[in-house]
Amino acid sequence: MAGQPLACQLQEEVTCPICMEILQDPVTIDCGHNFCLQCISQVGKTSEKIQCPLCKLSVNKNTFRPNKLLASLAEKIQSMDPADIQAEKEDSRCQRHKEKLHYFCEQDGAFLCVVCRDSKDHKSHNVTLIDEAAQNYKVQIESQAQDLGQKDKKIIEEKKQGEGAIWAFRAQVDLEKLKIHEEFKLLRQRLDEEESFLLSRLDWLEQQGAKQLRQYVTVTEKQLNSLRKLTKSLKIRLQSSSMELLKDIKDALSRGKEFQFLNPNPVPEDLEKKCSEAKARHESIIKTLTELKDDMNAEGKRDKSAFMNSLNKEEKESWSLLQKNNSVLPTSVPVTLDKSSADPDLTFSQDLKKVTLYIVAGKASNRQAKPRPFYPFHCVRGSPGLSSGRQVWEAEIRGPSGGACIVGVVTELARGAQSQTVSAQSYIWALRISPSGCQPFTNCKAQEYLQVCLKKVGVYVNHDCGEVVFYDAITSKHIYTFQTSFDGKVFPLFGLQVACSHITLSP
């Protein structure tokens, strides 16, 4: 029974060392040992001082203190089933010789009494006292526990690095998805623009053809009318008298002979040329698209075949389920720079993908008037913000001596924090990047310095999981992961410190 060892131990605690019975009216003497009041009182009757029967310390008789806790415990022990206590006592004795167990055999891992120790079964074995053996193993256990503790720390660190590597991998996947979305979006946009231009040009040529038809009909009808008038005048002359017929006859005949049909060109060469150019452009596009389709068809089949052959059974099932559900995971959108949130010393490219720090002396008063919540960095937020889901972007850093900057995320709470007791820097999770390395920074506290030289850093944010992952965008190696929880929307954050340095975003 699980309670038997405890029962035996408790009985030993409430046993009087003098009478070896359960304590009666237990008292504690100055040295701390406990006895029956009657038993200890019988020691040294003729003297005011006695020697403790256990430790031999001299104590005064009049200092005996009743021990109510032991008295209560003794009562409880006495109320227990004696069979349980006796069974425990038997467990501490040799089952074969009924002697008390004092020794431990290393070879057999068995407890021995004196008789067992001297027997032929154990005489040649390494036998030590139980307490000594326990002490030896205690040292081994402590050493092993310490080793396991070190392994625990190592596993935790490797787990942290492994999780970071997985987050960096997921960031790469999301970034590749974003690039594909953007490239195909641009391709579709370019095709739509090309289609629109080709059709618009043909619509215009059609309009010009209709206009040319009207002009051609007008010109030819006008000439026909002139010809018919001339013919009619000659026929009338035939019906007149001889004198009337001969009057101005030469002029009349001359007009008939000189009449020429001015046959205009139905379709001008300029329109013919424009139509030919449209057809040529269309044929060129069709040829390019046909080659692209053929190439994509061949390469696509090879790529799909290689991909499917690389999957095991379980992976194929998950792939089939994904295709069946047609559930494409949501992807993030490209990040641009928000000029409205920018430090006045920052300038931007037209596409809002590049920010450069130009410190102009004449703007000093403006800089002093406008608070710099992320001093000494000149900062700008990115757009759009993120209130759920994931977002990924990469930032290339350039400038004198490699530049110095911060890249990370900031919550919308940072806007009003600078005017209150809380610093705006309490709401950022970022890397301070310098030519010699980088340093994670959050809640106004810098973390350990990392000997990682970055030229291009990737940032992956999972709002739902509270993860901000940084990775080397060139090597794809994980750098650092913040694990937190976001209160509201978060935004990309970029800051520059060195004049003429710049950050370029992608995609």
Swiss-Prot record:
Tissue: Highly expressed in the gastrointestrinal tract, with high expression in the small intestine, moderate in the large intestine and weak in the stomach and esophagus.
Annotated keywords: Antiviral defense, Coiled coil, Cytoplasm, Immunity, Inflammatory response, Innate immunity, Metal-binding, Mitochondrion, Transferase, Ubl conjugation, Ubl conjugation pathway, Zinc, Zinc-finger
Enzyme nomenclature, EC number: 2.3.2.27
Biological processes annotated in GO: antiviral innate immune response; defense response to virus; host-mediated suppression of symbiont invasion; inflammatory response; innate immune response; negative regulation of NLRP3 inflammasome complex assembly; protein K48-linked ubiquitination; ubiquitin-dependent protein catabolic process
Gene Ontology CC terms: mitochondrion
PANTHER family in the record: E3 UBIQUITIN-PROTEIN LIGASE TRIM (PTHR24103)
Mutant lacking the gene: phenotype: Mice are viable, normal in size and without gross physiological or behavioral abnormalities. Mice are however more susceptible to infection with RNA virus due to impaired cellular antiviral response. Mice also show increased inflammatory response, characterized by enhanced NLRP3 inflammasome activation. Increased NLRP3 inflammasome activation leads to an aggravation of alum-induced peritonitis. In contrast, it attenuates the severity of dextran sodium sulfate-induced colitis, an inflammatory bowel diseases model in which NLRP3 possesses protective roles.
GO molecular function: ubiquitin protein ligase activity; zinc ion binding
Keyword Zinc-finger among record annotations: yes
Similarity comment: family membership: Belongs to the TRIM/RBCC family.
Protein name: E3 ubiquitin-protein ligase TRIM31
Subunit structure: May form oligomers. Interacts with isoform p52shc of SHC1.
Domain B30.2/SPRY: 315-507
Posttranslational mods: Auto-ubiquitinated (in vitro).
Family annotation (PROSITE patterns): B302_SPRY, ZF_BBOX, ZF_RING_1, ZF_RING_2
